[in-house]
Amino acid sequence: MAMPRKLKLMNVFLNGYSYQGVAKSVTLPKLTRKLENYRGAGMNGSAPVDLGLDDDALSMEWSLGGFPDSVIWELYAATGVDAVPIRFAGSYQRDDTGETVAVEVVMRGRQKEIDTGEGKQGEDTESKISVVCTYFRLTMDGKELVEIDTINMIEKVNGVDRLEQHRRNIGL
């Protein structure tokens, strides 16, 4: 019987600034595809046609204890679709073998929402920041598994750029 890898420790970096002890949780982007069913003559059913990423495929959210600091506010309404650099670093461990793996997700995008939550004197406060990303790179123990760059039309999975030929076909 095997045990799953569980997140034991994590950190979040925003524009290179560490949120150790402040970041509380991270919801990493769901990598979802836009699929459209197609059913042509002679087909007994439909087949999903892959039209790239869903519109919200690279959305993420993270929460922190307390009120956001100046680093977060400085990036609010920043110019550029990749103006907000975020890095998640996680240490996952299996409890049966003790094996640990480093998981890193590098993202760039724009802050969509800064929710400072409800403030009550003498009680814990939490803020949430939503970011719509245009860049996503997932590595595990230094091995790149997925890299998506929507602006530069790059989509690599295990080192294979699945859009390389498409870029050539349209002169890029």
Swiss-Prot record:
It is found in: Virion. One of its GO terms (cellular component) is virus tail, tube. It comes from the Viruses. Its main location: virion. GO terms for biological process: symbiont genome ejection through host cell envelope, contractile tail mechanism. Keywords: Late protein, Viral contractile tail ejection system, Viral genome ejection through host cell envelope, Viral penetration into host cytoplasm, Viral tail protein, Viral tail tube protein, Virion, Virus entry into host cell. Belongs to the P2likevirus major tail tube protein family. Forms the virus tail tube. NCBIfam families: tail_tube (TIGR01611). This is Tail tube protein. It comes from Escherichia phage P2 (Bacteriophage P2).
